Swiss-Prot record:
It comes from Photobacterium profundum (strain SS9). This is one of the proteins that bind and probably mediate the attachment of the 5S RNA into the large ribosomal subunit, where it forms part of the central protuberance. In the 70S ribosome it contacts protein S13 of the 30S subunit (bridge B1b), connecting the 2 subunits; this bridge is implicated in subunit movement. Contacts the P site tRNA; the 5S rRNA and some of its associated proteins might help stabilize positioning of ribosome-bound tRNAs. This is Large ribosomal subunit protein uL5. It comes from the Bacteria. Belongs to the universal ribosomal protein uL5 family. Part of the 50S ribosomal subunit; part of the 5S rRNA/L5/L18/L25 subcomplex. Contacts the 5S rRNA and the P site tRNA. Forms a bridge to the 30S subunit in the 70S ribosome.
Length: 179
């Protein structure tokens, strides 16, 4: 079992029950899933780029990504419906907690010129999204074998009803928000 999951059960739940005065511990917000998405628009011309992106995503997440396809044709971008244009991974359970722990303790501190994550990136329903400009902040990626630097989107989906509850949940894990 991941250390952060134990920490959530033993400490965070009690803190949030006291802070928001929940009547049941089932009302306490929890992290439901973490979604990683990598858009590879250049994959239209070079299929190898998408394969390399999928390999990077597999190393980062620990599971094989789903190749995303274009939903509709856009002449301006020279894409047609059904073209593979990216990959995504949805993490739940044990893998989610392992990834979340690595994200907070290892990857985020390795971001260049890091001054904290934007506290305004909540969506109004208690979910937090962030973008990473370089996949090389993750220790699983070998810097020498990277063909090109790619960014990815990370969305943390919580069961919180509001942004305030979600921010309290993530802050309890020492999530590095900007002051």
């Amino acid at each position: 079992m991941a250390k952060l999951h134990d920490y959530y059960k033993e400490t965070v739940v009690k803190e949030l029950v006291e802070k928001f005065e929940y009547k049941s511990i089932m009302q306490v917000p929890r992290i439901e899933k973490i979604t990683l998405n990598m858009g590879v628009g250049e994959a239209i011309n070079d299929k190898k780029l998408l394969e390399n992106a999928a390999a990077d995503m597999t190393a980062i997440a620990g599971q094989k990504p789903l190749i995303t396809k274009a939903r509709k044709s856009v002449a301006g971008f020279k894409i047609r419906e059904g073209y593979p244009i990216g990959c995504k991974v949805t993490l739940r359970g044990e893998r989610m907690w392992d990834f979340f722990e690595r994200l907070i303790s290892i990857a985020v501190p390795r971001i260049r010129d890091f001054r904290g994550l934007n506290p305004n990136s909540f969506d109004g329903r208690g979910n937090y999204s962030m973008g990473v400009r370089e996949q090389i902040i993750f220790p699983e990626i070998d810097y020498d074998k990277v063909d090109r630097v790619r960014g990815l989107d990370i969305t943390i989906t919580t069961s919180a009803a509001s942004d305030e509850e979600s921010k309290a949940l993530l802050s309890a894990f020492n999530f590095p928000f900007r002051k």
